[in-house]
Amino acid sequence: MTNLHRLMKEQNIIVNEHFYAYAKQYKELLEKWNKVHNLTGAKTPAQIDDFIVDAIAPITFLPPVKTAMDIGTGAGFPGMILAFGMPDTHFTLVEPLAKRASFLQFVKADLGLKNVEVKAIRVEQLDPQPYDLITSRAVTDTNMLLKLSEPFRQSGSLLLFYKGEKVYDEVSELSNYKIIEMVNRHYLLIES
């Protein structure tokens, strides 16, 4: 059993049959690209596994959605990883940094992902359109994420923000939200 399999089993995260194959290829590509381009702080295979588990964990509580947008995808956390585990959802990964967007495009092509689209621009430059799910990890505070995501929300859209313990300081003015606590993470789920 690989480290990733063990971590997923410990958190009772069940994924589709292709997830582990995609994750393995992704890890190999990330390790290779990261040496040259410094795409993420996760440097070792174990750290990358932790990032993958952190990114995919919300599939344990997310309802099925048709469309999703990830703001500030970086090296693929969480958007690319969620796309591996949610093959029926079309993901738009928004990443303005050219080196990271190039990596995401390469992963999409190398893995033959049909449910991923990469936008190499800032989210503020995207044409407004509604998404069922909007995600973000390590980009900015909740209020700014609410402003950035506003043109892309519709009634019933879900917002999923990957937060730390300070999330409780950011929700005082919110209603219609849940905080799901898992290992080393607080997932803020807001219904608009």
Residue ranges of each PLM-predicted region?
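Conserved SAM-binding loop of SAM-dependent methyltransferases across substrates and taxa
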Residues: 75-88
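Residue-level preference for alpha-helix termini and adjacent loops
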Residues: 14, 38-39, 76, 125, ...
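S-adenosylmethionine
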Residues: 89-92, 96-192
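Conserved beta-strand/loop positions that form the S-adenosyl-L-methionine
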Residues: 71-73
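N-terminal cationic-hydrophobic initiation segments that often serve targeting/anchoring roles
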Residues: 59-60, 83, 150
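Class I SAM-dependent transferase core
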Residues: 2-65, 69, 99-102, 106-116
